[in-house]
Amino acid sequence: MAGHSKWANIKHRKAAQDAKRGKIFTKLIREITTSARLGDADPANNPRLRAAVAAALTGNMTRDTINRAIQRGAGGGDGEQLETIVYEGYGPAGSAVMVECLTDNRNRTVAEVRHAFSKCGGNLGTDGSVAYLFSKKGLLTFVGVDEDALMDAALEAGADDVVTEEDGSIEVYTTPNDFGTVLDGLEAAGFKPQSAEVTMIPSTEAELDAETAPKLMRLIDMLEDLDDVQEVYHNGSISDEVAATL
């Protein structure tokens, strides 16, 4: 689940669950393989692949596993021929939800995604219904580093913005195309991100309360459990007090 920094603790807790971990790795490998098949097998020349590799590394996937996935994609052959489709919809309290999928069967995928929305009190929208509320950006998150030094290094590397959150974590934003360059520059300067991804950042938020927040979480869980779903983005905002009860 990708959303906003307020979800970081929930996202990382979910990622640590053994039941989820295997599925997360499967999704990462599919993204790496597809990115290598559709573009250059060298991450330095393929921004989408570079982002997929970065996400896999911060998720503790081994280099060997990553390289095998790249080789499988670059080799073409008779493997899965997947296409990327993004579905848009509405969750509880008018929250905007985008669902990024990799699929070999559009009909199956849209039926499963629509069912999840309907089951959780939301509804699947049309193309463009919520996409305008999001911007695609590279996002690098750092903890326990010197703020001034990181800011200097990030801006030198070509980052768009650097934001310090209330919990002390620091988020570095980039354009999707500059993501790899900024990541390489920061790592060369000695800064290793806690997480690194190209994600969708909402421009507005939908405030959720103790009643609607669990419904959005249920929708996200149902969507993420679908094999064809790679990422779920949303603009739901939940207070720390409500988040602690989820």
UniProtKB/Swiss-Prot annotation:
Cellular compartments per GO CC: cytosol
What does the UniProt entry say about where the protein is found? Cytoplasm
Which residue ranges run through the membrane?
A: none
| This protein's record includes keyword NAD | no
Query: What's an example of a GO molecular-function annotation for this chain?
Result: DNA binding
Q: Which keywords does this chain's UniProt record carry?
A: Cytoplasm, DNA-binding, Transcription, Transcription regulation
- Which SUPFAM superfamilies does the entry mention? YebC-like
Q: Name one GO biological process term.
A: regulation of DNA-templated transcription
Q: Identify the main location.
A: cytoplasm
By its UniProt entry, which HAMAP family does this protein fall under?
Transcrip_reg_TACO1 (MF_00693)
In which family does this protein belong, per the annotation? Answer: Belongs to the TACO1 family.
Name by which UniProt lists this protein: Probable transcriptional regulatory protein AHA_1522
What is the species of this protein?
A: Aeromonas hydrophila subsp. hydrophila (strain ATCC 7966 / DSM 30187 / BCRC 13018 / CCUG 14551 / JCM 1027 / KCTC 2358 / NCIMB 9240 / NCTC 8049)
